[in-house]
């Protein structure tokens, strides 16, 4: 008799958990806010809208990797973001190949400085945003000045910009967010 009660308790527990969680969801009880350390963009935007030419997209998402990106407007300020991006990629350990690093720039006057900066950080893809539309879109959807701050932003494998990390955010917290996302 004691074993039957124990068996019934084990079998009923998962069903009870599902029922209670469904009721909480139905009646609107949910956690307030998020535990993300990054800042979500005001609206999601897709990178398919940024084309370099009629056939060529700004960046390809065929490989199914997440993208850590930096838009370089000031090579000195962006060097900190590029360094942090490399360190975060290394800290991902076994997930290192699920993320690629990309640097964008549009100011052709900075081309030599940018290429010299990127040479310090191997495995970072450099992409020219010829029209500058990406920077404008980032600026319009962010709460900080993307032109001055040069923060790291995250793009999902489907090409949607998800979030960015304000300068000064603790790298351990950024790494924690990346591990949750990936």
Task: Cite the ranges covered by each PLM segment.
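Structural beta-sheet core signal
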Residues: 68-70, 101-104, 154
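Short active-site neighborhood of thiol/selenol oxidoreductases, capturing the structured segment around
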Residues: 59-78, 83-85
